[in-house]
Curated annotation (Swiss-Prot):
Keywords: Ribonucleoprotein, Ribosomal protein. This is Large ribosomal subunit protein bL32. Signal peptide: none annotated. It comes from Anaplasma marginale (strain Florida). The lineage of its organism: Bacteria, Pseudomonadati, Pseudomonadota, Alphaproteobacteria, Rickettsiales. One of its GO terms (cellular component) is large ribosomal subunit. SUPFAM superfamilies: Zn-binding ribosomal proteins. GO terms for molecular function: structural constituent of ribosome.
Amino acid sequence: MAVPKRKKSKSRRNMHRSHLALSAANVVIDPTTGEYKLPHHVCLGGYYNGKQVTESKV
């Protein structure tokens, strides 16, 4: 197994983890139903880009 040769300092450990932070999800309000949804996704009502594309699940 691989074993570190030297102890990694707290500073270097934290610098290594600097890109692991979670970012907030980008949600938008659907203009047809008024519910929150992810961009470029079909809403729960089955609408995409103002048109009904699937049957409603709610």
